[in-house]
Structures are given as C-alpha cells and as structure tokens.
Amino acid sequence: MKKVVLIGTGNVGVTVVYTMITKGIDAEYVLIDINTEFAKGHAMDMSDAIALNSTTGSKIRTGTYADAKGADLLIVAAGRPQKQGETRLEMIADNSKIMKDIALEIKKSGFNGFTIVISNPVDILATVFQKVTNFPKEKVMSSGTFLDTSRFRKFLSEKTGVPTNSVHGFVIGEHGDKSVVVFSRMQIGFSRLDDFLKSKALTEDDLKWISEKTYKEAYEIINRKRSTYFGIGASVAEMAESVLYNQRRIFPIGIYLDESKPGGGIYISRPAILGENGWEEVKNYDLSPAEQKAFDESAINLKKHWDDVQKEISF
C-alpha cells in the first residue's frame, strides 16, 4: 500500500487528504501538525469516513517527522494562512522560515519520495524546500497554477457555453497576480480561440475579464470565507493520483526553471508530465512574444523575492 504524509492539518491540507480518500486512492495516510490534538481529531474524523466506504483499504493516523521515512508522497501544507487583502508574496518571510524548519526535519528522516508543496507562496516555498533538502529537482514540485488554470477554464466555459472538460489551455508563471493566461495555445472544443474571436462569440474584453477574474477570484473567496481549500484540494489530489499511479498526465505546476533562463533558479509553473519519475517539462510549448515577455517578467519578479529570502535565511 502507498504511504502519504501530510504536514499541516489546516483546511487546505486535510481537504487534500479527504479528496484523495474519496477518489479511492488507497494509502496509509499520516497527519503531522504542531498541534497534535488537532491532527488527531482530523484523523479520527476521516477514519469514520473511511469506515463507511467498504471498498477502500486506506488507513489514517497521526505521526511525527520520522514517519516520513519510506513514504511515497509528502504533501506540505504548513504555514500561516493568507490574511484578507494580503498577496501571497507578502507571506514570504514567515512561511519561508517555517518551510526551512520542515525541510531540515524531512531531510533528517530519510524520506526519499516525491514532494508537493502547497503552502503559499508556493513558488518560493518549493524553492526553499528543494534548496534545503537538496532532493532531486524533478521529485519536488508545487501545486503552481493548476488551480488558476481550473478557474480560467471555468470562466471561459461560462462565456462560451462549452463544458470545462472541453476547454484546453493553461495558466503559467507565478501562482498569483503575475500569472499568465496562454491564450495563443487555447482550444475550445475542436476550435481555436481565434475562431471564437472571429465569429465574435468572444471579444478581447471577454479575454481581459477572464484574465483578471482568474487571479482575483482567490481574494474574493478569502474576503467571503477567509480561505480557499476545495479547489486546491481537488487540484492536488489529481496531482497525487498521477504521481502515485504513473498516469503521466499533464498539469501546469511549479517545476524548476533552469538558471540559464530569465529569472531562473526558482520553481515556477509550466506544463509538466507527472508520473513515477516525478515531473518532466513539456517540450516545445511555444508562447507568443507577448506571453513569453509576461512569463519572463513573472519569473524575474519571483527571483527577486527569492534573492531577498536568501538574505534573511542561510541555506
């Protein structure tokens, strides 16, 4: 049976695990949190849900960092939550220190599996985790812009009437305000985006609205209910399933950007194949000149923040 370890049992982390369980991903789930009683309460609650599903062989319990040894997958959701009106990048100082401490403990445990970082800001924190542990880059990833892509597909579906599973395209770059919607590679059903523009089924104003709505939606949700967790829970469960069962599906997730590229040396989202060897970047995913410029600017902006982190924290 697979073994999955979750660090951080707040709303986001436990929603990921619960979604994995309801999807039928059989595993031994181990919950780790600084608040051990809180984690134990979640384990007890979810074990009741497991008991109602006679087809699953899953088990769930609490544990310590030592339990990471032998695990197939580590999901890191620890960190302070995003405050109302706060950008993800404004959380860097606090959560980078937390991530460094976690990474040191995980390295000490002998863990040798795959890691999905979902604590915000995910791009920077995945970089912190990989630098501290020195784990193979392809075995560390972040949830990146997978959720942004889901939101974008939802809004494009609303505008066109085409179901979301027939809307194909990605959001790349920073998981945040400088994300980049790749309209040039978009396909809606069997048609290119240009066909919808030519027929006036979509307008340039529609595309602008979709782009803005995609990155602003998180703030709207946080203003209403203080945090987001169902969307990211579903997204990360999909990633976990692809890694654990070698499905080799393509997702827009945080992967390492080579130092030779503008803003390189950090994790940032591009399309990647996820399977038993970790992530593989999708090759020949060409962008329009404007999209490439926006992506480079997004990477350079993140790199500046990463440089600031390195001034505050020794690696």
Curated annotation (Swiss-Prot):
* MF GO annotations: L-lactate dehydrogenase activity
Keywords, in A-Z order: Allosteric enzyme, Cytoplasm, NAD, Oxidoreductase, Phosphoprotein
Q: Which residues form the signal peptide?
A: none
Q: What is its main location?
A: cytoplasm
Q: What is this enzyme's class at the first EC digit? A: oxidoreductase
Top-rank taxon, per record? Bacteria
Amino acids binding substrate: Q82, R88, N120, P121, V122, D123, D148, T149, S150, R151, T228
Q: Which family does it belong to?
A: Belongs to the LDH/MDH superfamily. LDH family.
Q: Write out the function statement from the record.
A: Catalyzes the conversion of lactate to pyruvate.
Q: What is the protein name given in its UniProt record?
A: L-lactate dehydrogenase
